[in-house]
């Protein structure tokens, strides 16, 4: 079976959006960021959604519905939220309808990237990382999620690599598998 999409999963700050956009550009495929789709759909930031009464549960429901809408199309690079894999049905849908690539990084690398992102003009707020000890929170969440991330088709350690290097690895691997 040829899988028709590439899904990029991984912890917050692993580079999913940046790398996904780069891979889509290189392959001339459509790039979709699920978090951005949710923001567009709800007219609320991810942080605002998390602050609603239903909080994370409500966000995960919207995330699942958005994924279900997207899997019916082809030639897409889909960047997911870091926690999408917490729902086993989401992971199964991605594995059945595409090739799942996990971007992995050490907790210190993730913290550095998230701090750099928070300094950008976007001022991205990561609700699940709202903590006095962010490194400890990253380690805890990563330890919980890593066994699920390991079910991906391919895992790339991104520490010390540029988005272009990671993108080239993804494309090289994709070509080997599907040529």
Which residues does each PLM region occupy?
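Hydrophobic anchor at the beta1->P-loop junction of P-loop NTPases
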Residues: 8
